[in-house]
C-alpha cells in the first residue's frame, strides 16, 4: 500500500526508496491517527548527487498535492541547508538519537543471531518485544540507564534456549540503505531467509555513519579535501565508538553473540 501511495504522489522517475519514504509518510498522515494541524515531518537531506537529496522536495510536493500544504517539513542536514524555525537540536539530542540507533543495531544482532536457532518458536520475538518497551522508556528519559539496559539485553538473549548443535548458513544483506534495513521495503527479506533455513546477517546502521566519516580520509588523500576534514571525520568515528562502547563491551562478554568490529 505504501508503494502505491508513493507512486501516486511522486514524479514518475522517482527511485524506489523515495516512493517508500513518501508513501509511508502520506499513509500515516491520511490514516486519521494524527492531528494534521499539530504535525510536522522531518527528513534528512544529504546534498549528494543521488535522489536522496530530493526527498524533502518530494514530500513537500506530495503534501501540497494531497491538500496538506500547512504541514511543515524539517530538512535535517549536517551542512545546514535550511533554517527550520521551531526546531532546535543540540548535542544532547544527537547523543540520544545515536543511542537509539545503537540499541536498534543491538536488537538486530541479538535477534538475528538467535531466532534461527530458538528451541521454542516465538520466544526470541517475545523477548525482543519486552526489551523494545524498555528501550523506549530509556529513550523517553533522555537515555538514562543506557549502559545497564544494553548489558541486560545481551544477558537475557544469552540465556534464551537455543539449538546449539545446529549451524545454519549465514547470508549477508547489503544494498541501498533504506531498502536494506526496512522490512516492508525488502519484502521482509530476513524472515524469508530464516524460513529458507539461513541466518541473516545485517550490518549495523551506525557503521554507515562511520563509513561517512571515514570517507573524509579518502577525500583528503585522493580528492584534495583538507586535512582538517579528515581529522574531523576521525573524531566523528571516535565519538561513535565511545557512544556504543557499552554495546561492544556487553557483546564481548557474551558467550554466543558477536560484537561489531572497528572500522
Model-inferred region functions:
Residues 88-263:
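A charged, amphipathic alpha-helical module
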Residues 15-16, 45-57, 175-184, 207:
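Gly/Ser/Thr-rich loops at beta-strand to alpha-helix junctions
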Residues 1-6, 11:
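Single conserved hydrophobic/aromatic residue that forms the stacking wall/gate
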Residues 5-7, 70-80, 199-209:
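A generic structural motif
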Residues 27-89:
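N-terminal glycine-rich phosphate/adenylate-binding segment common to multiple enzyme folds
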Residues 8, 40-45, 172-175:
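Glycine- and acidic
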